[in-house]
Amino acid sequence: MSGAGEAAIRARFRLDWPGFALDVDLDLPGQGVTALFGHSGSGKTTLLRCIAGLERAAEGELRVRGEVWQDATRFVPTHRRPLGYVFQEASLFPHLSARGNLEYGMKRSREPLARAALDDVVGLLGIGRLLDRRPEQLSGGERQRVAIARALAVKPRLLLMDEPLAALDFARKQEVLPYLERLHDELDIPVLYVSHAPDEVARLADHLVVMQDGRAHASGPLGDTLARLDLPIRLGEDVGVVLDAVVAARDPAWHLVEMAFAGGRLWARDNGQPLGHRGRVRILARDVSLSRAPVSGTSILNTLPAVVVDSVDDGHPALVLVKLRVGDSPLLARLTRRSAHALELAPGRQVYAQIKAVALVG
């Protein structure tokens, strides 16, 4: 991704409905993918609709890359906002081919994407061979890729994506996710991505907003926010951290790669990325155990020195969630309270983190 990330999104809204109130005040990056994450009913889609101008009753302020879309005296209607919107369902026109749907998107834009740029989007999303097909001739994943291309055809300054994979089965999600990762790398505009799926957030997001009961309870860089212990929602088995890492070495005999991050190196399964590839690793708290001294004669490949930062109760009276610092990187470990007591864990305690599984997610 290129371009200046300093041009930000200022979003402040208040909306009162019977039984629900949205009250948010956010400053978001002007580039990259911001995930709006939370349980159903937390206000994610309502916030997205306010940003799109679909909730006229919402009071507030919206500035996108220096442009005022809404304030006390001005309200730019949806059709005049330079944005693209991708819904859970592809919502393509059934009587038009994929090409016709893209051309429709270009016609409704005051400043449509240039033909050469549209060709780039078509290639990026891998839909060139699908352009002459009608929506009923496409799989769910193919329809959604065409819908994303149509949203980009209007040359938006902001792309809104409301759980674009929610209607797809697992196989179709795995089909579409690599294309979304390619968009993440190539797009020069901010993307707001609504999801309640931790794996999607781990793969795609740069910035994370945690929503609950109509409010933004946390907002910050993905890695830092996931490692917070004070989030109002628990991710259950999915709690963990995401770390930026680089493929530093390869062990072809055992089909492994060594990932360098700001805290050391980790062995992971080789997925074919070249040396120097910048990606992400995801480490779940359930896959981290602790010891007071190095352990030998174990099947665990990754053991790193760490320092205890803090700990909190973890939803069940038997469990505790421990935050660690490995070099400059955060790490989470889920332990039984009995184990934490036996290890005499306290802030500042030096331990060894044994990491049973490392997943490359980008």
Curated annotation (Swiss-Prot):
Keywords: ATP-binding, Cell inner membrane, Cell membrane, Membrane, Molybdenum, Nucleotide-binding, Translocase, Transport. InterPro entries: AAA+_ATPase (IPR003593), ABC_transporter-like_ATP-bd (IPR003439), ABC_transporter-like_CS (IPR017871), Mo/tungstate-bd_C_term_dom (IPR008995), ModC_ABC_ATP-bd (IPR011868), Molybdenum_import_ModC (IPR050334), Mop_domain (IPR004606), P-loop_NTPase (IPR027417). Gene3D superfamilies: 2.40.50.100, P-loop containing nucleotide triphosphate hydrolases (3.40.50.300). PANTHER family: ABC TRANSPORTER I FAMILY MEMBER 10, MOLYBDENUM IMPORT ATP-BINDING PROTEIN MODC 2. It comes from Thiobacillus denitrificans (strain ATCC 25259 / T1). Transmembrane segments: none annotated. PROSITE patterns: ABC_TRANSPORTER_1 (PS00211), ABC_TRANSPORTER_2 (PS50893), MODC (PS51241), MOP (PS51866). It catalyses: molybdate(out) + ATP + H2O = molybdate(in) + ADP + phosphate + H(+). Its EC number is 7.3.2.5. This is Molybdenum import ATP-binding protein ModC. Part of the ABC transporter complex ModABC involved in molybdenum import. Responsible for energy coupling to the transport system. One of its GO terms (cellular component) is plasma membrane. Residues 297-362 form the Mop domain. It is found in: Cell inner membrane. One of its GO terms (molecular function) is ABC-type molybdate transporter activity. It is a peripheral membrane protein.
